[in-house]
Amino acid sequence: MNLLQDQPAMGIDQTTLEHLARQWEDLAPEAILAEAVRCFGDKLVLASAFGPESIILLDMLVKVWPRPQAFFLETGFHFPETLALKDRVLARFPQLQLEVVGPLMSVAQQNAIYGERLHDRNPDHCCAIRKVEPLNRALAPYKAWIAGMRREQSPTRGQIGVVQWDSRRGMVKFNPLATWTHKQVWAYIVERDLPYNPLHDEGFPSIGCSPLNCTAPVADGADPRSGRWRGKAKTECGLHA
């Protein structure tokens, strides 16, 4: 458990974290979060789009971090239900220090430069403008971040470690819920009576931006992320891949 603490942040590399991930594979998420807070303090941040996983992580974090830090990427295309949930979460966790980070250009500016419905014609470019660049800016002050990724969510996430090296940004990334199942997530939500997006009750297991070609409902038993970028080869927005 002391491997991170024993090395300066600049000395942590992929090999170190792969070893640590194997050691931590069976640790409870709360223990991983406690270690992350102990090692990185105010250089640690939670990425939250207010999915159930990030709300669970926040509920766990407040037990070990008096004023947890998080950021929310305001793409300009969120469902109204997502924005309403943000307010409910802030009311539930008033100690949360939330930074709202937006793109460098408004939706109107993007439409003027690239034309309307860029998300339909070139979703990678739209995600780069509205998600990836803001994410990189949001993470710049930090040395480590926490995400709600789970292996069960999609094949592209099937090999993630509970802790890993984010080589793109040169920092540590924690995935404390990597081993959790869909059933575990919702059992925790119910047990703790946590707020969640009502769209989950309407067939949306994975919620991103509101255009239906970016986020659509899926059939029972289908891949939870199959409603994202429907009809496209795209499987990730670029935040985690």
From Swiss-Prot:
It comes from Gloeobacter violaceus (strain ATCC 29082 / PCC 7421). It holds the Pfam family PAPS_reduct. Residues 221-241 are annotated as: Disordered. This is Phosphoadenosine 5'-phosphosulfate reductase. It comes from the Bacteria. The active site is at C237 (nucleophile). Pathway: Sulfur metabolism; hydrogen sulfide biosynthesis; sulfite from sulfate: step 3/3. It catalyses: [thioredoxin]-disulfide + sulfite + adenosine 3',5'-bisphosphate + 2 H(+) = [thioredoxin]-dithiol + 3'-phosphoadenylyl sulfate. One of its GO terms (cellular component) is cytoplasm. SUPFAM superfamilies: Adenine nucleotide alpha hydrolases-like.
